[in-house]
Regions:
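Hydrophobic alpha-helical core bundles mediating ligand binding, dimerization, or RNAP-core interactions
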Residues: 69-74, 94, 111-119, 152-156
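Metal-dependent phosphoesterase signature
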Residues: 94-129
Length: 245
Protein backbone atom coordinates (compact mmCIF):
# COMPACT_ATOMS: atom_id res chain seq x y z
CA UNK A 1 0.00 0.00 0.00
CA UNK A 2 2.89 2.34 0.82
CA UNK A 3 4.18 1.95 -2.75
CA UNK A 4 0.77 2.75 -4.21
CA UNK A 5 0.45 5.83 -2.02
CA UNK A 6 3.92 7.00 -3.03
CA UNK A 7 3.17 6.52 -6.72
CA UNK A 8 -0.12 8.36 -6.37
CA UNK A 9 1.58 11.24 -4.59
CA UNK A 10 4.35 11.32 -7.23
CA UNK A 11 1.88 11.58 -10.11
CA UNK A 12 -0.28 14.07 -8.22
CA UNK A 13 2.69 16.40 -7.72
CA UNK A 14 3.70 16.10 -11.36
CA UNK A 15 0.15 16.69 -12.56
CA UNK A 16 -0.04 19.82 -10.43
CA UNK A 17 3.34 21.04 -11.71
CA UNK A 18 2.52 20.57 -15.39
CA UNK A 19 -0.91 22.12 -14.97
CA UNK A 20 0.75 25.16 -13.40
CA UNK A 21 3.37 25.26 -16.17
CA UNK A 22 0.77 25.13 -18.96
CA UNK A 23 -1.22 27.92 -17.30
CA UNK A 24 1.92 29.99 -16.88
CA UNK A 25 2.90 29.61 -20.53
CA UNK A 26 -0.64 30.49 -21.63
CA UNK A 27 -0.55 33.58 -19.43
CA UNK A 28 2.82 34.73 -20.75
CA UNK A 29 2.23 34.12 -24.45
CA UNK A 30 -1.47 34.90 -24.82
CA UNK A 31 -2.76 37.02 -21.95
CA UNK A 32 0.35 39.14 -21.60
CA UNK A 33 1.26 39.48 -25.25
CA UNK A 34 1.89 43.20 -25.19
CA UNK A 35 5.63 44.05 -25.20
CA UNK A 36 7.20 44.77 -21.82
CA UNK A 37 10.55 46.31 -22.76
CA UNK A 38 11.78 48.45 -25.63
CA UNK A 39 14.08 46.34 -27.87
CA UNK A 40 17.30 47.87 -29.10
CA UNK A 41 16.16 46.93 -32.61
CA UNK A 42 13.30 49.45 -32.54
CA UNK A 43 13.84 51.93 -35.35
CA UNK A 44 13.74 55.67 -34.82
CA UNK A 45 10.63 57.56 -35.81
CA UNK A 46 10.53 58.87 -39.35
CA UNK A 47 7.89 61.46 -40.17
CA UNK A 48 8.67 61.94 -43.89
CA UNK A 49 5.49 60.15 -45.02
CA UNK A 50 3.35 60.77 -41.95
CA UNK A 51 -0.34 61.18 -42.77
CA UNK A 52 -2.22 60.00 -39.65
CA UNK A 53 -1.78 60.82 -35.97
CA UNK A 54 -3.50 58.57 -33.44
CA UNK A 55 -3.99 59.75 -29.87
CA UNK A 56 -4.85 57.98 -26.68
CA UNK A 57 -7.70 59.75 -24.85
CA UNK A 58 -7.70 59.69 -21.04
CA UNK A 59 -4.42 60.91 -19.60
CA UNK A 60 -3.29 62.18 -23.01
CA UNK A 61 -5.97 64.49 -24.41
CA UNK A 62 -8.32 64.42 -21.41
CA UNK A 63 -7.96 64.50 -17.67
CA UNK A 64 -8.15 60.91 -16.36
CA UNK A 65 -11.18 59.55 -14.54
CA UNK A 66 -10.86 59.90 -10.77
CA UNK A 67 -13.52 57.36 -9.82
CA UNK A 68 -12.51 53.72 -10.12
CA UNK A 69 -15.77 52.32 -11.45
CA UNK A 70 -14.17 48.88 -12.03
CA UNK A 71 -13.11 48.50 -8.42
CA UNK A 72 -16.26 49.98 -6.92
CA UNK A 73 -18.63 47.92 -9.04
CA UNK A 74 -16.63 44.74 -8.46
CA UNK A 75 -16.61 45.32 -4.71
CA UNK A 76 -20.32 46.10 -4.46
CA UNK A 77 -21.37 43.22 -6.74
CA UNK A 78 -18.74 40.78 -5.39
CA UNK A 79 -17.81 40.15 -9.02
CA UNK A 80 -14.57 39.35 -10.83
CA UNK A 81 -12.87 41.90 -13.07
CA UNK A 82 -13.93 39.87 -16.12
CA UNK A 83 -17.58 39.90 -15.01
CA UNK A 84 -17.39 43.66 -14.41
CA UNK A 85 -15.82 44.23 -17.84
CA UNK A 86 -18.54 42.22 -19.62
CA UNK A 87 -21.27 44.23 -17.89
CA UNK A 88 -19.63 47.61 -18.51
CA UNK A 89 -18.75 46.82 -22.14
CA UNK A 90 -22.29 45.74 -22.99
CA UNK A 91 -24.15 48.97 -22.29
CA UNK A 92 -23.95 52.73 -21.78
CA UNK A 93 -27.08 52.63 -19.58
CA UNK A 94 -25.83 52.81 -16.00
CA UNK A 95 -29.18 51.77 -14.53
CA UNK A 96 -29.19 48.67 -16.72
CA UNK A 97 -25.63 47.83 -15.66
CA UNK A 98 -26.40 48.16 -11.95
CA UNK A 99 -29.51 46.01 -12.27
CA UNK A 100 -27.59 43.35 -14.21
CA UNK A 101 -24.86 43.31 -11.53
CA UNK A 102 -27.54 42.99 -8.81
CA UNK A 103 -26.47 46.16 -7.01
CA UNK A 104 -28.97 46.83 -4.18
CA UNK A 105 -31.46 49.56 -5.02
CA UNK A 106 -30.59 51.37 -1.80
CA UNK A 107 -27.03 52.09 -2.99
CA UNK A 108 -27.71 52.59 -6.72
CA UNK A 109 -28.50 56.31 -6.45
CA UNK A 110 -25.23 57.10 -4.66
CA UNK A 111 -23.23 55.04 -7.19
CA UNK A 112 -24.91 56.72 -10.17
CA UNK A 113 -24.27 60.19 -8.75
CA UNK A 114 -20.56 59.44 -8.28
CA UNK A 115 -20.17 58.14 -11.84
CA UNK A 116 -22.06 61.09 -13.35
CA UNK A 117 -20.04 63.58 -11.30
CA UNK A 118 -16.85 61.87 -12.43
CA UNK A 119 -17.86 62.04 -16.11
CA UNK A 120 -18.94 65.68 -15.77
CA UNK A 121 -15.53 66.67 -14.40
CA UNK A 122 -13.58 65.15 -17.30
CA UNK A 123 -12.18 67.96 -19.43
CA UNK A 124 -9.66 68.26 -22.27
CA UNK A 125 -6.15 69.29 -21.30
CA UNK A 126 -5.67 73.01 -22.09
CA UNK A 127 -3.37 72.36 -25.04
CA UNK A 128 -5.39 69.47 -26.54
CA UNK A 129 -8.01 71.22 -28.67
CA UNK A 130 -5.66 73.94 -30.04
CA UNK A 131 -3.22 71.17 -30.99
CA UNK A 132 -5.85 69.05 -32.76
CA UNK A 133 -7.24 72.08 -34.56
CA UNK A 134 -3.79 73.04 -35.83
CA UNK A 135 -2.94 69.49 -36.92
CA UNK A 136 -6.22 69.25 -38.83
CA UNK A 137 -5.44 72.55 -40.56
CA UNK A 138 -2.11 71.06 -41.60
CA UNK A 139 -4.03 68.22 -43.29
CA UNK A 140 -3.17 65.42 -40.87
CA UNK A 141 -5.89 62.80 -40.41
CA UNK A 142 -6.57 62.38 -36.69
CA UNK A 143 -7.86 59.39 -34.74
CA UNK A 144 -8.41 58.47 -31.10
CA UNK A 145 -7.79 54.96 -29.80
CA UNK A 146 -8.95 54.47 -26.22
CA UNK A 147 -9.23 51.60 -23.76
CA UNK A 148 -12.57 52.43 -22.18
CA UNK A 149 -16.19 51.48 -21.61
CA UNK A 150 -19.33 52.94 -23.26
CA UNK A 151 -20.14 55.16 -20.27
CA UNK A 152 -16.90 57.10 -20.78
CA UNK A 153 -17.05 57.42 -24.57
CA UNK A 154 -19.34 60.45 -24.39
CA UNK A 155 -16.79 63.06 -23.26
CA UNK A 156 -14.37 62.02 -26.00
CA UNK A 157 -16.88 62.51 -28.81
CA UNK A 158 -18.32 65.63 -27.19
CA UNK A 159 -14.99 67.44 -27.08
CA UNK A 160 -13.17 66.12 -30.15
CA UNK A 161 -15.69 65.27 -32.89
CA UNK A 162 -14.93 68.51 -34.76
CA UNK A 163 -11.29 67.52 -35.22
CA UNK A 164 -11.05 63.73 -35.12
CA UNK A 165 -12.09 61.57 -38.08
CA UNK A 166 -12.08 58.16 -36.40
CA UNK A 167 -12.77 56.91 -32.88
CA UNK A 168 -11.63 53.43 -31.87
CA UNK A 169 -13.01 52.20 -28.54
CA UNK A 170 -12.05 48.94 -26.86
CA UNK A 171 -15.62 47.81 -26.23
CA UNK A 172 -16.28 47.87 -29.98
CA UNK A 173 -13.20 45.84 -30.94
CA UNK A 174 -12.51 42.13 -31.17
CA UNK A 175 -8.97 42.71 -29.90
CA UNK A 176 -8.56 45.18 -27.08
CA UNK A 177 -5.88 47.84 -26.84
CA UNK A 178 -2.74 46.15 -25.55
CA UNK A 179 -3.18 43.04 -27.71
CA UNK A 180 -0.78 43.02 -30.66
CA UNK A 181 -3.54 42.31 -33.20
CA UNK A 182 -5.38 45.44 -32.09
CA UNK A 183 -2.78 47.69 -33.74
CA UNK A 184 -2.83 45.82 -37.05
CA UNK A 185 -6.64 46.03 -37.03
CA UNK A 186 -6.32 49.76 -36.32
CA UNK A 187 -4.02 50.29 -39.31
CA UNK A 188 -6.36 48.26 -41.52
CA UNK A 189 -9.35 50.35 -40.44
CA UNK A 190 -7.41 53.52 -41.32
CA UNK A 191 -6.31 51.91 -44.61
CA UNK A 192 -2.69 53.00 -44.22
CA UNK A 193 0.70 51.30 -43.86
CA UNK A 194 2.33 51.48 -40.44
CA UNK A 195 5.03 54.00 -41.40
CA UNK A 196 2.38 56.63 -42.19
CA UNK A 197 1.00 56.51 -38.63
CA UNK A 198 2.15 58.16 -35.41
CA UNK A 199 0.72 56.99 -32.07
CA UNK A 200 0.83 59.43 -29.14
CA UNK A 201 -0.11 58.35 -25.62
CA UNK A 202 0.83 58.27 -21.96
CA UNK A 203 0.78 54.50 -21.40
CA UNK A 204 4.27 53.06 -21.84
CA UNK A 205 3.19 49.61 -23.05
CA UNK A 206 -0.23 50.06 -24.68
CA UNK A 207 0.43 53.38 -26.39
CA UNK A 208 4.17 53.36 -27.02
CA UNK A 209 5.71 49.88 -27.08
CA UNK A 210 2.78 48.05 -28.68
CA UNK A 211 2.35 50.57 -31.50
CA UNK A 212 6.11 50.54 -32.13
CA UNK A 213 6.03 46.75 -32.27
CA UNK A 214 3.34 47.01 -34.98
CA UNK A 215 5.65 49.18 -37.10
CA UNK A 216 4.17 52.57 -36.30
CA UNK A 217 5.96 55.70 -35.24
CA UNK A 218 5.23 56.39 -31.57
CA UNK A 219 5.81 59.06 -28.94
CA UNK A 220 5.41 58.48 -25.22
CA UNK A 221 3.80 61.39 -23.38
CA UNK A 222 5.86 60.65 -20.32
CA UNK A 223 4.73 60.80 -16.71
CA UNK A 224 6.98 61.57 -13.78
CA UNK A 225 6.83 57.91 -12.73
CA UNK A 226 7.40 54.54 -14.34
CA UNK A 227 9.27 53.69 -17.52
CA UNK A 228 9.69 56.27 -20.23
CA UNK A 229 9.99 55.63 -23.96
CA UNK A 230 13.16 56.63 -25.76
CA UNK A 231 11.12 58.84 -28.08
CA UNK A 232 8.97 60.97 -25.83
CA UNK A 233 7.11 64.20 -25.21
CA UNK A 234 7.12 66.22 -22.01
CA UNK A 235 3.95 68.08 -23.04
CA UNK A 236 1.38 67.68 -25.81
CA UNK A 237 2.28 70.90 -27.61
CA UNK A 238 5.88 69.70 -27.87
CA UNK A 239 4.56 67.50 -30.68
CA UNK A 240 4.65 70.48 -33.05
CA UNK A 241 8.35 70.95 -32.37
CA UNK A 242 9.05 67.26 -32.92
CA UNK A 243 7.18 67.32 -36.24
CA UNK A 244 8.79 70.66 -37.14
CA UNK A 245 5.49 72.27 -38.11
Amino acid sequence: MGGVDSDFFFWLVHAFFYTWLIFRLYFVFFLMNEPREEPESFWKNNYDQLSHIIFDAYGTLLSPSKYNIWQELGKRAKATREEVWRALAASDDLQEILDKMAIPKASQKEFMEKVRDDIAQIQPHPDAIPLLKYLKERKYSLAIDSFLIPLYAGPIKEHFSDYVEKFVFSFEQQHMKGESQHYFDLLQSLNIPAHQALFVGDHYRRDYLASKAAGMNALHLSNKWGKVGKEKLATLDELLTVLNI
